[in-house]
Structures are given as C-alpha cells and as structure tokens.
C-alpha cells in the first residue's frame, strides 16, 4: 500500500513520502497481532500528513516572497501622476489617467480643418450642430429632424390639432403645452414676467364690419383698445360726453375711470377722513350720494318690537326698498361726498336685526334676508356672527353604484352646482379657442390663465361687448 501527498501548485507534483507496510508470508491466525499492526499504520499516516502540510505552507510563503522581490515594490509604493497629485498602485491605471490631461484628444474627422475638443460631450455637440443629418425642417417653426415621418407627426400634433396663438396677427397653431414657448420665441416684444399684463383674446377684425386694427403696433393691448374704440365710436354711435362733476372735460370712450382718478371737482369735494359720514334723520335724504350708516337702516331693538320673525323680515325688506327709492328720487343738491360706486353698491355697516350678522354692502344684506329669513327659505343660519361659514353637502348617490350618498361638502353654492355636473356628466364651461370643456368654473379659470393669458372676467366682458 502506497500513500502519495502533493504540494501546491498542481503543476509541480512532488512525492513527499511513501510507506510500505510489512507483508505477511502466510495468513496470521493471531487476531491480536493484526490489531497492533493497524494502530501503528494509522499513527504513521497522521504524522506524515502533518509534516506535509507544514512543508507546503513554507513553500508557498517562499514563492510569494520571491515574486514580490522580483517586482521590486511593496504595498507602500505608488506611481505618482506628473500633472497632478494623484497616485496609482499600477502603471496601467496611471497611463489611463494621464489621457485626461490631454485637452485636445478628441478630434472631429468630418471638418476640413483640424478641430479638437477636450471632452467627448463637446465633440458630440459640435457634430450635432455642424454635421447633423437633420435636413428636414418644419415649415412653420424651427423644429428639424432627419426623418420626414417625424416632421409630419410634429406638424399634425402641433400645427393642425393645436390651438391658435393668442397674439393678435399670429395665425400659427401650436400645441397647448408649447404656447408659452412659442410666444417667448416668436413674440419677443411681449413680456412674460410674473407680473405680466394678461393679453386679451385675439380678434383679427371687427365682428360687425371689415375693420382691422393697426398691425404696425406690435402691442396686442393697443390693438385690442383700438378695436374697442372703433366698435364704440362707429357701431354704438357714442359721442364724447361731458363730465357730470362739473369740471368741463369731455370724456371719450373707455376713459371714464381714468378721468375720475384725476378729476379736479372730485378731489375738491372729497372730505377728510376725520369728518364722519352725515347721518340720515327723520327719513329725509339731504344728500342722495351719501353713504348709508348703520343707524339709518337698523335702529335700536326697542324700535323694532315684533310679534314674529316674518314681520321683522318684511319690515327690513321694506326699509331697504325705501332707501332705494329715496336714493333714486331724492334731491339733486350738490353732494358733499362723491362716490364712484353705483347706486346698488352702497357701502356702510348694515346689520341683520334677526341674527345680528353685519355686512359692508346693502346688497349683501338684502341677499342674506332673502336666503335665510324669508318664508320660502329652508336654510338655517346660526347667530354666531360673520365668522360662520355655510357648508353645502352633496346628497346625490355615489358614482360607484352604491346606495350611499356622495356626502362631499363645499363652501359655496356655486361649487356644489359645479359638483353636480360631475354626477350628471355635463361640461358646461367650454373654451372657444381650443374646444376644451370643463365641469367646474374654477378649473376653466385656471385653464384660461395658464394657456391663454386671460381671465373669466376679461372673457365675459369680451362676450358682452362683441357678442362672441
């Protein structure tokens, strides 16, 4: 029997020792002698294996030390870069690093002259700018592409299915999300700051005749004002009116509000802030344009002793109507204080005699009495003062098909009615420029402000003026 032990590496096979146990010429009949022989054989094998492992470890250590001596370096030795302070353990890493310091290692192979760049990104930008294959260009904007199919898709999405530009005189259609970029790129004279003037809806000509605004002026506000003056002067037959305050100035169309801020008669007749507003006594109006105070309408609690809430409501409504009639048919003496507001928007401190809620406008008090304290009213208001906020709850069925109600609450009645449009699937608010429809008025206002630089107030005034 022979035992072989090998040393690492396998390519260098070395026989460490061999062992041949003594052989018996004849079969032994004594079992004790066989047991002793097996014990001696096992002990010799274990001792030989320990000696072999120790020798293998010593050989490996000597080979590792010899390889390090041949390299001529240790762990603490590094290769420094001659251009910077970096150090590298291996020379190939240093060679790759030195290429970074070569500022002109990227060369354009398509230029007639030698053109080199320090980074690959600069080379790509140069190639895209001067050697790009995008030979196809959009006929209405600066979009380019190397494939005609992309040009056709861009033209359909942006210029066919898009919305018209809101600037007067521009007939280009663009995508809704690119409208601001189009105005910034092609209409540089129009400021797009955070406090920009909202441009009106564009009209290329008068809807009643063939008149067109002056296109030499690039400002859309001036073009729109010119068109409005034309409609008021020609189609509505309005002549310049004399100022009713007695200053002798003739007012043109659209200049009433500007004149009131600088009218000499108005400035002279405005009393100082220290003077109190004259009270109206004995149901006689000495001044038809004087603001109404709280004492004029409400009075004390002893003066209004009623048997029921309906009587108080009726008397309060009669008092408000009497004030309106006295304002309308009152004396025409020169007023001590001129108000810019109309007759229906008289300011003051108006209080409800039933719930003691106060209002600054008489119209709001009238509306409050009609909604909360009339005989047909079903709403209940708490006498907690003006801080109380009404909650309008939706009683429609849920959209999921369950028998439960929706249960959503809203602060205003208008918001509740807009929410009903969601249940009914109705979109009553439509944008005439891009044909987009909305359930709620607030979402329509956000759309006009974001994409058309206008507001619902301007749109309503435009419809009232032009009918479109």
UniProtKB/Swiss-Prot annotation:
It holds the Pfam family zf-C2H2. Its main location: nucleus. GO terms for molecular function: DNA-binding transcription factor activity, RNA polymerase II-specific; sequence-specific DNA binding; zinc ion binding. Residues 17-28 have a biased composition (Low complexity). GO terms for biological process: regulation of transcription by RNA polymerase II. Keywords: DNA-binding, Metal-binding, Nucleus, Repeat, Zinc, Zinc-finger. InterPro entries: Znf_C2H2_sf, Znf_C2H2_type. It comes from the Eukaryota. Gene3D superfamilies: Classic Zinc Finger. It is found in: Nucleus. GO terms for cellular component: nucleus. Residues 29-39 have a biased composition (Acidic residues). Residues 17-76 are annotated as: Disordered. A zinc finger (C2H2-type) spans 79-101, 136-159, 350-373, 392-423, 429-452. This is Putative zinc finger protein F56D1.1.
């Amino acid at each position: 029997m022979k035992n072989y032990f090998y040393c690492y590496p396998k390519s260098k096979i070395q026989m460490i020792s061999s062992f041949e146990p003594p052989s018996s010429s004849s079969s032994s009949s004594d079992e004790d002698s066989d047991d002793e022989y097996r014990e001696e054989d096992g002990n010799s094998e274990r001792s030989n294996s320990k000696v072999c492992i120790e020798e293998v470890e010593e050989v490996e250590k000597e080979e590792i030390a010899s390889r390090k001596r041949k390299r001529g370096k240790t762990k603490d030795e590094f290769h420094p870069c001659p251009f910077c302070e970096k150090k590298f353990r291996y020379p190939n890493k240093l060679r790759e690093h030195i290429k970074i310091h070569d500022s002109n290692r990227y060369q354009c192979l398509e230029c007639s002259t030698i053109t080199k760049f320090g980074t690959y990104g600069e080379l790509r930008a140069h190639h895209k700018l001067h050697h790009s294959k995008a030979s196809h260009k959009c006929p209405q904007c600066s979009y380019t592409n190397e494939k005609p199919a992309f040009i056709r898709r861009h033209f359909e999405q942006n210029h066919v299915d898009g919305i018209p530009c809101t600037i007067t005189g521009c007939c280009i259609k663009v995508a809704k999300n690119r409208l601001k970029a189009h105005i910034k790129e092609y209409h540089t004279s129009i400021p797009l700051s955070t406090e920009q003037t909202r441009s009106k809806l564009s009209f290329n000509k008068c809807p009643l005749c063939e008149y067109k605004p002056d296109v030499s002026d690039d400002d859309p506000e001036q073009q729109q004002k010119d068109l409005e003056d034309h409609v008021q002067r020609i189609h509505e037959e309005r002549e310049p009116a004399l100022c009713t305050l007695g200053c002798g100035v003739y007012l043109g169309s659209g200049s009433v509000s500007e004149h009131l801020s600088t009218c000499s008669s108005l400035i002279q007749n405005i009393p100082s802030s220290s003077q109190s507003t004259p009270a109206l006594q004995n149901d006689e109006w000495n001044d038809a344009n004087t603001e109404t105070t709280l004492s004029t309408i409400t009075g004390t609690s002893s003066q209004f002793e009623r048997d029921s809430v309906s009587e108080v409501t009726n008397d309060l409504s009669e008092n408000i109507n009497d004030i309106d009639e006295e304002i309308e048919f009152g004396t025409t003496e020169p007023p001590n204080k001129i108000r810019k507001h109309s007759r229906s928007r008289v300011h003051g401190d108006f209080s409800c005699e039933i719930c003691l809620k106060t209002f600054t406008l008489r119209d709001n008090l009238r509306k409050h009495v009609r909604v909360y304290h009339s005989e047909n009213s079903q709403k209940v208001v708490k006498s907690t003062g003006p801080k109380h906020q009404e909650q309008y709850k939706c009683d429609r069925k849920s959209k999921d098909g369950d028998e439960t109600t929706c249960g959503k609450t809203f602060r205003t009645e208008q918001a509740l009615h807009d929410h009903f449009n969601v249940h009914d699937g109705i979109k009553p608010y439509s944008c005439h420029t891009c044909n987009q429809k909305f359930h709620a008025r607030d979402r329509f206002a956000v759309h006009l402000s974001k994409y058309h630089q206008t507001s619902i107030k301007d749109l309503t005034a435009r419809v009232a003026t032009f009918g479109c």
